[in-house]
From Swiss-Prot:
Catalytically driven reaction(s): (4R,5S)-dethiobiotin + (sulfur carrier)-SH + 2 reduced [2Fe-2S]-[ferredoxin] + 2 S-adenosyl-L-methionine = (sulfur carrier)-H + biotin + 2 5'-deoxyadenosine + 2 L-methionine + 2 oxidized [2Fe-2S]-[ferredoxin]
Family: Belongs to the radical SAM superfamily. Biotin synthase family.
Native source species: Proteus mirabilis (strain HI4320)
Stated name of the protein: Biotin synthase
Obligatory cofactor(s): [4Fe-4S] cluster; [2Fe-2S] cluster
GO molecular function: 2 iron, 2 sulfur cluster binding; 4 iron, 4 sulfur cluster binding; biotin synthase activity; iron ion binding
GO terms for biological process, alphabetical: biotin biosynthetic process
Amino acid sequence: MSTLKRWTLKEARALFDMPFLDLVFQAQQVHRQHFDPSQIQVSTLLSIKTGACPEDCKYCAQSARYKTGLEKERLMEVQQVIESAKKAKAAGSTRFCMGAAWRNPHERDMPYLEQMVKEVKALGMETCMTLGKLDDSQASRLAQAGLDFYNHNLDTSPEFYGSIITTRTYQDRLDTLDKVRNAGIKVCSGGILGLGEEVKDRAAMLVQLANLPQPPESVPINMLAKIKGTPLADNEDVDPFDFIRTIAVARIMMPRSYVRLSAGREQMSEQTQAFCFMAGANSIFYGCKLLTTTNPTEDKDHQLFRKLGLNPERLSVSMGDQQQEDVLLQAVAEKDTEQFYNAAL
């Protein structure tokens, strides 16, 4: 069995310093060794609990500390989540990610979260959640419910992190990733560009991710969505070439991971997105809203896919659509009615 490469910051910086076209070419070569370059994984992200988060992440509209005009909402009812998942599947998504604006899940919410996972899986979709910090018991319960992926981003480098967040340490994030991995759940973890970081911070963040005991199976790279009312609302835009470079370096350093274009895609031109796919991005979030920010519409995505000759990746499942529907209906029929309909309470 081959051992995973341990990356140094010097090596990562050297990749960032490569001539742009050479870097993209190398990234595309690496990409083709592990993935079909014509396939794009399509994921949908739903905010199942919005706003009133106690954390102070300076980029986030969901923080209760900033006046962004975002209306807080309680945890969605399970039935609402399943209806959204059905629509996402019909639109072509194979993975459904559920995000909640919490520091960590409350124990009273765990049964509803577990049920969401079970019923989305009954649709034949991959499941992902992002709920903040987890303890060992919570990670184990989500794993037993069948959760495929857990998202918990590192955001930036350890050195720059304290300039962006003070209510949760970098080690807290690494500890949550360890708990997720130990529970048998796949890891989704990436970062954000445009926070005011330097190239060395982008390199250091990717080194942290690549050098985890096992690199994340999924690496979302976000471009800061500047939200009025947050401390970073007036930050400078990220140069598209710098964003593409980061995608390419992520692909080279984590060759077997899905590299996802996440927040900020609404602001990207088709040409920038195309270069990102050339640089090794092979996953997108799909749909009208990405938590609390806009995202390109499905029609625009389909048009771009056609222009580039790309196809949405299909998820292999063991059950046919009718079997999946039968499983879902049976799961609903067996549910405690009060829990199913009053998950928001």
